[in-house]
């Protein structure tokens, strides 16, 4: 019988020492997607907990998160839980309890927006500043770092020089979005959803007003653009800028998408894993932030899962083509053209082969008309006949040679429904001992080492060469574990015969012991102490744009020197016209109406207001040319002012429950 004698230690010689560890941070709607993100190469995953997670329909139970944590930690990967909504006073106590529960599950960090959380009695969990904190300046970044944030998510609108300046001024880890949907407004500075519907983006319930069609009018009422999706951005794609972002100081590379499905997360995670690995391999000063190597069983493509077109936004310079004005939907890639439309089928000429189940579409008068190919039949070279599941009536409106797109590649998607990746941690194996006892040492790539012994009587083998090969091969069989054998050394006094069944059991027990040792040696971060002397907030007056929604947040800002604090927009104290969006995206620039482009004298710049119209909704656009920003001006609707404040106890009571509290009428 095997004796259990596990010893683990960190061996410095086996640990890659680097001050530049790169973290690939993937989104997860649920625990199943989180596991696949890790298997496809994520160094960390961010996921919503049971509440306050800034995504209305992406919450997960404490049980699911508690089961996810050890899975991640076996790969050295981290779990960050989002608690990045602004909180009403009635929610502070439940939030405090939730944070304590999350800490007990072993999660690595909380991503937060509300500064009131820092005033609560919570465990010493590591804190990350959400993108909702609107971190655009060196002063704000340094302040957040100094009050206890270990990692800060910078605004998507920053350029390389701005990122570099923040990195040089603070010791916080710099996190930056590299892929996914773009909010047109600065994150945390969008109130249009609450103004129009009562659904607060700062509380995870955005109504997506930015994806609606608008008509743009100038100050004379003339139409500049009719019924276009003028606030809808293309999707972020920083593939080409990864090296430059590393040089600017980014260490955590974040993929957007806690609403995205599993195929999307698998694909985009795999894409950036391969991109970052190539950079790490090329440069000697970089390392990945977690353990293992990842093998993908498909070819990742950012163009084959949901996207609205690609832009690198403002990382290099302002560009005119950042908007997805024609449609906020995923139209996919061009694959050819429609040649003829019949009653129940269409003939197409294509540049790529089609398959049964493909999703195809055409754009007709700004509307995407899509259909699923039930059956396709090749009729000639690059020619197909397609029978849709259901023939859209609008297809008969198009003329020959109308462009055809594919937004679902059925064969490619099928690969993602199966096992599409494998991730294994390297282990060095050494077998020593003597005829009465075998000693097996396993050392993981992080340097965690265990020894396992097996007592018995192991005689010299008749065929020494065969016995040695059997021992090496048997010890390297780690297929049912998360490990792979990087090196196998046999240091025995001779070629001993060990029955395969005994060797297999010996190896399995050692691998289990290594699992336990690696989990025991895992070190999660903790709350960063406040700097001494205490920092001072860079402003003394905070407007509603600071999103202060509870007394604890007020106490926080007062503690650090703020004197006057206006209530958050959700408090319904801003009843007049205010900026309901502040954006770096500028419609004057997009339509070549920017005064800076036309004139060189700053004193003569004059950008008159414009209007955005959607049905009965009229929004005023004002332009602040010095910082190059557009302000979307609107007013909260009267019926919303009469609603209970979001997050309050009253707001959580349903109408039926409220009726039950009314006194019953007598006879």
Pin down the residues of each PLM region.
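Aromatic- and glycine-enriched glycan-recognition loops and surfaces
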Residues: 57-66
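Short, glycine/polar-rich helix-capping loops at beta-to-alpha or helix-loop-helix junctions
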Residues: 136-140
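Residues at the C-termini of beta-strands that transition into short coil/loop
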Residues: 131
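Short active-site loop/helix that positions an aromatic residue
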Residues: 118-123
């Amino acid at each position: 019988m095997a004796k259990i004698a596990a010893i683990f230690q960190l061996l410095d010689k086996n640990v890659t020492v680097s001050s530049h560890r790169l973290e690939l941070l993937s989104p997860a709607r649920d625990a199943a997607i989180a596991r696949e993100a890790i298997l496809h190469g994520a160094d960390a995953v961010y996921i919503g907990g049971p509440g306050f997670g800034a995504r209305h329909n992406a919450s997960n139970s404490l049980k699911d998160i508690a089961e996810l944590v050890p899975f991640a930690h076996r790969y050295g990967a981290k779990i960050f839980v989002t608690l990045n909504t602004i909180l009403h006073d009635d929610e502070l106590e439940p939030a405090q309890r939730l944070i304590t529960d999350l800490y007990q599950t072993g999660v690595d960090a909380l991503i937060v927006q509300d500064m009131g959380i820092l005033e609560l009695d919570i465990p010493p969990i590591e804190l990350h500043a959400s993108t909702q904190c609107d971190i655009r300046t060196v002063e704000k970044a340094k302040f957040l770092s100094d009050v206890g944030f270990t990692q800060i998510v910078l605004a998507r609108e920053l350029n390389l020089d701005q990122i570099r300046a923040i990195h040089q001024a603070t010791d916080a880890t710099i996190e930056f979005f590299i892929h996914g949907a773009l909010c047109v407004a600065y994150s945390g500075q969008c109130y249009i959803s609450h103004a129009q519907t009562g659904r607060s983006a700062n509380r995870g319930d955005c109504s997506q007003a930015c994806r609606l069609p608008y008509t743009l009018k100038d100050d004379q009422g003339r139409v500049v653009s009719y019924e276009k999706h003028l606030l809808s951005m293309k999707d972020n794609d920083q593939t080409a800028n990864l090296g430059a972002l590393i040089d600017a100081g980014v260490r955590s590379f974040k993929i957007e998408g806690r609403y995205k499905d599993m195929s999307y997360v698998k694909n985009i995670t795999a894409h950036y894993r391969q991109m970052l690995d190539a950079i790490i391999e090329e440069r000697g000063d970089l390392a990945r932030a977690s353990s293992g190597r990842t093998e993908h069983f498909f070819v990742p493509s950012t163009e084959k899962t949901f996207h609205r077109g690609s832009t690198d936004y403002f990382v290099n310079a302002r560009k005119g083509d950042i908007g997805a004005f024609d449609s906020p939907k995923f139209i996919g890639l061009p694959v050819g053209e429609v040649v003829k439309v019949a009653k129940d089928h269409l003939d197409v000429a294509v540049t790529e082969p089609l398959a049964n189940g493909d999703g195809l579409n055409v754009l007709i008068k700004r509307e995407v008309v899509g259909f699923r190919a039930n059956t396709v039949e090749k009729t000639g070279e690059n020619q197909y006949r397609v029978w849709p599941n259901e023939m859209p009536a609008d297809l008969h409106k198009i003329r020959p040679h109308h462009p055809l797109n594919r937004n679902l590649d059925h064969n490619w998607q099928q690969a993602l429904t199966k096992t599409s990746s494998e991730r294994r941690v390297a282990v060095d194996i050494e077998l020593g001992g003597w005829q009465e006892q075998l000693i097996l040492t396993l050392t993981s790539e992080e340097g965690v080492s265990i020894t396992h012994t097996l007592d018995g009587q192991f005689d010299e083998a008749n065929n020494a060469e065969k016995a040695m090969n059997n021992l090496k091969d048997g010890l390297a069989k780690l297929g049912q574990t998360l490990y792979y054998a990087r090196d196998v050394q046999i240091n025995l006094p001779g070629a001993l015969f060990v029955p395969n069944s005994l060797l297999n059991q010996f190896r399995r027990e050692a691998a289990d012991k290594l699992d336990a040792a690696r989990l025991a040696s895992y070190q999660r971060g903790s709350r960063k102490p406040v700097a001494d002397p205490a920092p001072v907030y860079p402003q003394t007056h905070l407007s509603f744009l600071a999103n202060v929604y509870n007394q604890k947040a007020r106490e926080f800002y007062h503690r650090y020197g703020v004197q006057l604090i206006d209530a958050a927009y959700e408090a319904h104290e801003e009843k007049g016209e205010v900026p309901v969006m502040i954006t770096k995206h500028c419609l004057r620039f997009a339509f070549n109406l920017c005064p800076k482009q036309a004139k060189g004298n700053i004193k003569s710049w004059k950008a008159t207001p414009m209007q955005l119209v959607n049905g009965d909704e009229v929004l005023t656009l004002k332009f602040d040319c010095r910082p190059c920003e557009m302000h979307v001006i609107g007013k909260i609707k009267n019926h919303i002012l009469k609603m209970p404040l979001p997050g309050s106890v009253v707001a959580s009571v349903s109408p039926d429950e409220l009726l039950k509290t009314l006194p019953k009428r007598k006879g």
